[in-house]
A protein has these predicted regions:
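Exposed, low-structure sequence patches enriched in small/polar residues
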Residues: 1-265
């Protein structure tokens, strides 16, 4: 079911999806000892006017993966997936900001106490007016994004035929479990002259490699980007870009850069 509401500059919608009982694949095997349903809640709201906009999204997934062949559950390429579920995080533009990319977690895995995800995303845009101290002659555009995703808090029971217990789990409706991913970004776009403009970009990420990829630990990183474009006239321009990623993982410290010359024939 879905309900939408719009009034002037405000909008809001909520959606609820229910999945019927389905066999859960555990340890590479399907068994009728572990059969349960799933659900999804999605809520989105926002407000926009000239020079300002805000958008907030909340989502809760529980056992919402669905495949045309049940044995395909858990494959890393999402083959046979019927309802692909995207991760609700910012789509970054730069190379080093896309090393740790979050995937929506909708599967059940009792070994890692997983049954889905809960979290949200917030987008904020503001344009500082022209002819002000921070806006300057052409104005300044600022964009903020924050997202946070965690597991579902609850109790997870392993299959134990000797003890007479069936595999199962019971989770809280709005309970937050272990952290899966977080992303905070700040983008500043500034036009200096009719021919010269720049972008300053900062991102802080936490990425639970064990949950998203199946092995590893939490990786926290900070990424900074500077980009500047200068128009040379006659359809020609030169663009410079410098990127730096620092993390608490010895294998994930990177530096990158680009110099690009564009011509329009």
């Amino acid at each position: 079911g879905r309900v939408d509401f719009y009034q002037n500059k405000f909008y809001s919608n909520i959606e609820y999806v229910l999945k019927s009982e389905d066999a859960i694949k555990q340890g590479g095997q399907l068994s009728n000892r572990f059969v349960t349903g799933g659900s999804a809640i999605l809520f989105n709201t926002g407000y926009s006017k000239s020079g300002f906009g805000i958008d907030a999204t909340f989502r809760r997934l529980e056992n919402m993966n669905f495949f045309s062949e049940r044995n395909a559950a858990g494959n890393v390429f999402n083959e046979s997936s019927i309802n692909y579920i995207p991760g609700l995080t910012k789509q970054h533009d730069y190379l080093l900001t896309n090393i740790f990319v979050y995937q929506a977690q909708s599967t059940v895995n009792l070994d890692t106490s997983q049954s889905g995800e809960i979290g949200g995303q917030l987008d904020l845009f503001y344009k500082i007016k022209k002819e002000t101290l921070l806006g300057g002659k052409y104005g300044t555009k600022i964009a903020l994004n924050a997202s946070y995703w965690a597991g579902l808090s609850g109790d997870y029971i392993q299959d134990n035929p000797d003890a007479g217990t069936l595999p199962s789990y019971e989770v809280e409706l709005f309970g937050f479990g272990g952290k899966y991913f977080s992303d905070f970004s700040l983008e500043i776009r500034k036009k200096w002259t009719p021919k010269w403009r720049s972008i300053l970009y900062f991102v802080n990420q936490s990425y639970n490699k064990k949950i998203v990829e199946g092995s590893g630990a939490m990786i926290t990183s900070n990424i900074g980007v500077i980009e500047s474009t200068h128009k040379l006239g006659n359809g020609k321009s030169i663009r410079f870009e410098a990127q730096k990623l620092n993390s608490d993982s010895a294998k994930h410290d990177w530096t990158g850069g680009t110099i690009e010359y564009n011509l329009n024939s």
